[in-house]
């Protein structure tokens, strides 16, 4: 069972990964 702290940490990790992937894709699209 996950605690609230680990759940929030996992949520922020997923959010950061999604934002990083999104900005990475936009940079690649601009280079094309």
Swiss-Prot record:
GO terms for cellular component: chloroplast thylakoid membrane; cytochrome b6f complex. The chain crosses the membrane at residues 4-26. It is found in: Plastid, Chloroplast thylakoid membrane. Keywords: Chloroplast, Electron transport, Membrane, Photosynthesis, Plastid, Thylakoid, Transmembrane, Transmembrane helix, Transport. One of its GO terms (molecular function) is electron transporter, transferring electrons within cytochrome b6/f complex of photosystem II activity. It is a single-pass membrane protein. GO terms for biological process: photosynthesis. InterPro entries: Cyt_b6/f_cplx_su6 (IPR007802). Belongs to the PetL family. The 4 large subunits of the cytochrome b6-f complex are cytochrome b6, subunit IV (17 kDa polypeptide, PetD), cytochrome f and the Rieske protein, while the 4 small subunits are PetG, PetL, PetM and PetN. The complex functions as a dimer. Component of the cytochrome b6-f complex, which mediates electron transfer between photosystem II (PSII) and photosystem I (PSI), cyclic electron flow around PSI, and state transitions. PetL is important for photoautotrophic growth as well as for electron transfer efficiency and stability of the cytochrome b6-f complex. This is Cytochrome b6-f complex subunit 6. The gene is petL.
